[in-house]
Amino acid sequence: ILNDEISKIDRILPVVKALVGEGVICSVDTYKAEVMEAVLGEGAKIINDISALTFDKRSLEVIASAKASVVLMHMRGDPHNMMAHTNYKDVVSEVWEYLDNRIKVCVNAGINLDCIAVDPGIGFSKNTKDNFKLIDKLEFFESLPCSKLIGISRKFGVNKVANNRLNESISLGISSIRKGINILRVHDVLETRRALDSWLIERNQLK
């Protein structure tokens, strides 16, 4: 294990232990198999991988063996050069095809389909136009045979300060749910939950 991986594990494990001890379902963002093994061993349930389990050869095996849940995100390149890879012909169909392929790879590796969620990767290797094309066509992803997650919280808005984009985040979140998204990744959990509850009441869907 490289020193930076050891350092990350040392930083994360106490937090994971504390959250799991409080009964919280814990998700960890990582694309490194060693980190996955460590946090899953302490009770984390979900791995969120921006590389869709492609950066580390062992990651597929680790997730399958642990019977963990995983979020597969679309991204071209890596976090350092991803914005040099925005030359899409059809961003919606290309992202769909990538995620569809990664689902199949994961299932073939022994990961249960019920444990997989996909994320179109808003803001990752996409320019503003691409991002809004994806948001506009989210219903296109309903045909993928697993849960769908999106992270758009605080990414867009008239205010340049990300912390002041609550209204836009809630609006886009509700729109995403209406288009078939199952999971919202948000900063403002309480406010988003209240807005969703209000919308569900209006739609007579609250049980």
Residue ranges and their predicted role:
Residues 112-115:
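Short acidic capping loops at alpha-helix termini that bridge into adjacent secondary structure
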Residues 107-109:
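Conserved C-terminal portion of the radical SAM core fold
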Residues 122:
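Active-site metal-binding loops of divalent metal-dependent hydrolases
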Residues 1-26, 31-34, 40-41, 45-105, ...:
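Active-site-adjacent loop and "lid" segments of alpha/beta metabolic enzymes
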